Amino acid sequence: MPFTKQLKALSDAFHERGIECKWNEPMAGHTSFRIGGMATLVAWPAGQSQIITVLNLWRELGGKCPIAVLGRASNVLIPDRGFHGLIVLTTRAKRVVFAEDEAVDKDAFRLENKFTCQVFAECGASLALLSQSCAKDERGLSGLEFACGIPGTVGGATVMNAGAYGGDMQSILLASEYYDLTNGYTVTLRAEEMGLDYRHSIYLDHPEWIVLNSVMLLNYGSAPDIRARMEFNTQNRRDKQPYELPSAGSVFKRPVDNFAGRMVETVGMKGACVGGAQVSEKHAGFIVNRGGATAADVMELVHRVQDAVEALYHYRLECEIQIVDDGLDPNGPLTWD
């Protein structure tokens, strides 16, 4: 197996520092798709400082084996052959600080006023849980209502500029801090430096930059009104989206002046299956795992949908699910193209 020596050294170093790790971990249980082969080594750092320790060790011990840093893996597809390297799961790095409770470096970001509150969140913090916390009577913070049903982490949402129901991360982000795998430096970017656009940020262009935390600016409002908006969004999701089956959320980026789901349905692909993967019969913008689906099933189904839509509309849908590939397949990396 490639990189065994470096991975063994990493495992030993993690144990010495009290960082939990496991060998040959099945990744299907860690993804919302419930799909994926085994990762050679998986680490669970307990907070941002341990994430930095893990990444520093990876660099110090060679920096050659494949590495992927994931949160709740709600928007990813892991190949059936697995990941022959180190996967870092950040879900235990979930510290959240509200500026009204504890000082945030206000000089580094934007001065708050009586109408707003800065919120600092480590990359592994649950976006949905954070939105629920903001809606409590003692908080009454508005801006994250769109996120109440998004299953990912703050880090993943920052990378993808996640959004729904007219809101997105771009509308609330002040800054984010990242670790650069190429040199070991940590860097803070202001929102205007993050290249935020529809389902895009500069982090997608720089996979070597690992988001450590984000700072958001939320507005004070009526907690009951905030909760009412969240309940409306939640019910809308339940009514229209296939939450009863594993998926990776919306599959395709929204085209200009159209909807991906509508286009997929128009070309007759709603309900189409490949193996255990199916275009949802409830919402054609989703692909669900009906049981036993493989990554290969999903990829083949995505390609069939793209081909069918392109044949009619002369437009190729862009898949927004991220493939976690170790780059070791002799046939080349897996892509949606």
Model-inferred region functions:
Residues N113-K114, M160, N289-R290:
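Short coil/turn segments at secondary-structure junctions
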Residues L41-Q48, L77-D101, C123, V159-A191, ...:
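Structural signature of FAD isoalloxazine-binding scaffolds in flavoprotein oxidoreductases
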Residues C134, E138, V154, T158-A162, ...:
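Short, well-ordered alpha-helical segments in soluble proteins
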